[in-house]
Amino acid sequence: MKATHTKQAIREAMDHLIDRATNFDIDALDSIYHQDFHTTLVMPDSTVQTFNKVEFKEHFAKQALEGQTQLNTWADWHDFHILGDSAVCVLTRKHSGMNGEEMKLLCNIELRFEDGRWQVLREQIFLRPLSEG
């Protein structure tokens, strides 16, 4: 197994994503998110929002311009799975960056190893009130 294709390497890529996204580092997100990036947010009322790479970076840039402070970096790691140059990370997050309210985020993150680094290709995020546990 390549040293880059380990659970530890995926965890490091995800830690980097969390650190840069929670600090609204749009330049870093440009290299973290794959050119074909797509995210799906399922809101608590079951409405769905989708973003491509440009749109999602704009979402973070807007929060930075509005003076949003650093988002919560808390994460609970559930699973890492690597298959060739693809990987999936399943985790739970807590932060207010998706809708302005501190929420629990159930995340399924797909990564692709390309250009010598892991890049986030897809995110499926289900937002739930913190009161749900």
What are these regions (language model features)?
Residues 59-62, 89-93:
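Short Pro/Gly-enriched beta-strand edge/turn motifs at strand-loop
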Residues 84-86, 115:
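Residue-level signal for tight coil/turn positions that link beta-strands
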Residues 96-102:
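Short, cysteine-centered beta-strand-loop-beta hairpins and adjacent loop/turn segments enriched
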Residues 104-133:
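Short beta-strand edge/turn micro-motifs at domain boundaries
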